[in-house]
């Protein structure tokens, strides 16, 4: 995902803030959802841009509290699908339903992007508390504590590292008690160590709070570390739905983890089998030798 211009970033943050205020004005609707995850049903969804079909009759389901990761090559349609689930765009055919009700932009859904979209003129705690009535600001402080930033509450966003900014964005999403959290490559701009730390934090909060999660990522290892299922989209179609039954927390160095990662990676890279891959490698080596 491309980084946005500072002015555009501020505008997007302002939009997020106003959406949060709108949702905060609907306490009855929010309370009616209860707690825990929400069921997601994507049925025969089609999406076109300028006459070109980018999603072809996609079907996807997530049970309440399930963590589903979507992987695939750039341009395959995975972020488009997430935007449709978020209600940021409309499908040309098919339907998205949450707990059996038509999707839209309900207060039970929050999105976390690669860009934290923090308001630069508000301190960290105030960024988390956007849209909350003053009596709920203690909730914002509690979420900051849960993401490990209680001591940075009065800092300006500009003084935070990239990983810290994403922790604030995560707290801001979760303070509204979403039943569905949509993660659009939220860790893509972070260094490897910070990324692993954030993965552990997201998993910990997901297990504690019980929301349904839908993650879009290019990182197959990240998908397997976090998800109950890894879904592969190729050319606008779901071509793999891989269960991940490994015990949590996941250990990347194990043979079982590596086997699932290899299975998904080979599908992403469109390699049919280890034998086919080895044969291709030997063929290329022979070509290089003869050249």
Curated annotation (Swiss-Prot):
Pfam families: ABC_tran
Keywords (A to Z) from UniProt: ATP-binding, Cell inner membrane, Cell membrane, Membrane, Nucleotide-binding, Translocase, Transport
UniProt catalytic activity: ATP + H2O + aliphatic sulfonate-[sulfonate-binding protein]Side 1 = ADP + phosphate + aliphatic sulfonateSide 2 + [sulfonate-binding protein]Side 1
Binding positions for ATP per the UniProt entry: 72-79
Subcellular location(s) of the protein: Cell inner membrane
Enzyme class: translocase
Membrane topology: Peripheral membrane protein
Source species, domain of life: Bacteria
Protein task: Part of the ABC transporter complex SsuABC involved in aliphatic sulfonates import. Responsible for energy coupling to the transport system.
Family assignment from sequence similarity: Belongs to the ABC transporter superfamily. Aliphatic sulfonates importer (TC 3.A.1.17.2) family.
Subunit structure: The complex is composed of two ATP-binding proteins (SsuB), two transmembrane proteins (SsuC) and a solute-binding protein (SsuA).
Protein name in the entry: Aliphatic sulfonates import ATP-binding protein SsuB
Source organism per UniProt: Cupriavidus metallidurans (strain ATCC 43123 / DSM 2839 / NBRC 102507 / CH34) (Ralstonia metallidurans)
Lineage: Bacteria, Pseudomonadati, Pseudomonadota, Betaproteobacteria, Burkholderiales
The encoding gene: ssuB
């Amino acid at each position: 995902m491309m980084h946005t211009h500072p002015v555009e970033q501020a505008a997007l943050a302002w939009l997020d803030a106003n959406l949060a205020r709108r949702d905060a004005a609907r306490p009855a609707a929010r309370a009616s959802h209860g707690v825990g995850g929400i069921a997601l049903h994507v049925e025969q969804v089609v999406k076109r841009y300028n006459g070109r079909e980018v999603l072809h009759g996609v079907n996807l389901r997530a049970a309440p509290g399930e963590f589903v990761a979507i992987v695939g090559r750039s341009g395959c349609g995975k972020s488009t699908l997430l935007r449709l689930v978020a209600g940021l765009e409309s499908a040309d055919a098919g339907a998205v339903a949450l707990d059996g009700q038509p999707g839209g932009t309900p207060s039970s859904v929050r999105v976390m992007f690669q860009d934290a979209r923090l308001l630069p003129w508000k301190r960290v705690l105030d960024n988390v508390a956007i849209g909350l009535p003053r009596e709920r600001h203690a909730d914002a402080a509690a979420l900051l504590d849960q993401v490990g930033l209680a001591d940075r509450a009065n800092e300006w966003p500009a003084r935070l590292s990239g990983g810290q900014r994403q922790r604030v964005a995560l707290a801001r999403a979760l303070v509204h008690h979403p039943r569905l959290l949509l993660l659009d490559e939220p860790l893509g701009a972070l260094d490897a160590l910070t990324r692993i730390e954030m993965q552990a934090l997201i998993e910990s909060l997901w297990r504690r709070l019980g929301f349904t999660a839908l993650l879009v990522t290019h990182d197959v290892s990240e998908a397997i570390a976090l998800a109950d299922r890894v879904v592969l989209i190729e050319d606008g179609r779901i071509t793999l739905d891989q269960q991940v039954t490994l015990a949590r927390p996941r250990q990347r160095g194990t043979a079982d983890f590596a086997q699932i990662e290899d299975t998904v990676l080979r599908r992403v890279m469109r390699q049919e089998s280890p034998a086919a891959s080895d044969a291709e490698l030997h063929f290329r080596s022979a070509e290089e030798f003869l050249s």
